[in-house]
């Protein structure tokens, strides 16, 4: 009679784990999809990515590597058996589930662990950062069978995406830069000094016409698109906005027009075609 009682703690633990997963899914709908932290050990530090995919059998081909905005530090970690990370409200982080289909995997790229205190813009230009991202993407390719990668950055994360792609043309077929930081500021040079001739990947600019952030002005997006000779997708409408001008829930983060913006980017990845303007 007493033997079955040995299984009660296991059943309770399983129920608690399932309840925790459901609670996480309610707080962050992206966590309702299969996800895991992929970590690569480097020389005394690690670099990790948060991988999300559809459940069931997938024939994965496309990988979308997302580089979030300032400070670009997710701090992917486990606390009390639960996945924890920062920047959940970031445009790319909060919308990542909308990329998913049977052929597509999404990975949000964290800063290298030894740069969690300060992830400077200048560091993202260095060969070491390029090698770190390459190691993570190569491991994701090996584990999941992805053969076609697009690097996507938003705001300050555009620097990460651009330089990681510039240094790894064999991995990044395409780069999409959204709400990009164009001008120099206290955090670094932005994209003000980049050499577009050094980028071999296909490039797409995506920007909201009413972006209120002074470091990411729409007029600069127009100028950089012309300078690079690459297409610019203009996003209009959306809202309502909340928070500061350079924060994620304003036009800077495509609030209210996220899905239409992602659909245009997805179309470009698959077909090379995008509309000139996007509105909800």
Where are these regions (language model features)?
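N-terminal cap/lid segment of alpha/beta-hydrolase-fold proteins
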Residues: 24-59
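Primarily recognizes the serine-hydrolase "nucleophile elbow" in alpha/beta-hydrolase
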Residues: 138-198
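Alpha/beta-hydrolase active-site loop
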Residues: 91, 118-144
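The feature captures the conserved acid-bearing segment of alpha/beta-hydrolase catalytic domains
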Residues: 174-237
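C-terminal catalytic histidine-bearing segment of alpha/beta-hydrolase fold enzymes
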Residues: 229-280
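Bacterial N-terminal signal peptides
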Residues: 9-18
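Short, surface-exposed "cap/lid" segments of acyl-processing enzymes
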Residues: 56-98
